Amino acid sequence: MTRKSRRLILIAACGAVLALALGLILSAMSGSIVFFRSPAEVAAQGVPPGTRFRLGGLVKDGSVKRGPDQNVEFAVTDTNATVPVQYRGLLPDLFREGQGIVAEGTLDVGGVFRADTVLAKHDENYMPREVADALKAQGRWQEGGSKEAPKDASKAAPKDAAKPETADATLGQRSER
């Protein structure tokens, strides 16, 4: 074998190993990729039953019904379409009607979204980016909010007021190292 043919075989072998590694990475990731959809997209695209995705929107006013054993039924809307949701488990503390959420789960044959995870917003101005983008694309986005946080820092509690007097003195020393 000549030097040139050995070099070509080495390059081909490296390329094959790289292609195999890339294929394994992509196949491993395909099971963990979850797409985001708004209620309008679910209605328009006819999502096949059993497809796993994230559903984002606002909890429709008057739709929350709590059942036995932590079963909760509610509807998610983006003002164009509404999708009924069933969830079993503890809801986040910030979950309430009219607030933005993202639920992850599957759509059943009857068109009910069966969520296994529900994430709620974290303050009065937050909306999941995907939900905001979907509302903007539909022309239903409203900038700003009617409530604003006070801008006067003097109304905030002093930093030392929250410190308990029974704190472990060694904890501060360990955390400073």
UniProtKB/Swiss-Prot annotation:
GO CC annotations on file: plasma membrane
Keywords: Cell inner membrane, Cell membrane, Cytochrome c-type biogenesis, Heme, Iron, Membrane, Metal-binding, Signal-anchor, Transmembrane, Transmembrane helix
Pfam families: CcmE
Coiled-coil ranges per UniProt: none
Residue spans, topological domain Cytoplasmic: 1-7
Positions on the Periplasmic side per record topology: 29-177
Entry membrane topology: Single-pass type II membrane protein
Basic and acidic residues bias (residue ranges): 145-166
Major localization class: membrane
Disordered, as annotated region: 133-177
Top-level taxon: Bacteria
Residues binding heme: 122, 126
GO biological process: cytochrome complex assembly
InterPro entries membership: CcmE, CcmE-like_sf, NA-bd_OB-fold
GO molecular function term, any single one: metal ion binding
Membrane-crossing residue ranges in chain numbering: 8-28
Subcellular localization, as worded in the UniProt entry: Cell inner membrane
Family of the protein in this entry: Belongs to the CcmE/CycJ family.
Role: Heme chaperone required for the biogenesis of c-type cytochromes. Transiently binds heme delivered by CcmC and transfers the heme to apo-cytochromes in a process facilitated by CcmF and CcmH.
HAMAP family reported for this sequence: CcmE
Protein name: Cytochrome c-type biogenesis protein CcmE
Native organism: Methylorubrum extorquens (strain PA1) (Methylobacterium extorquens)
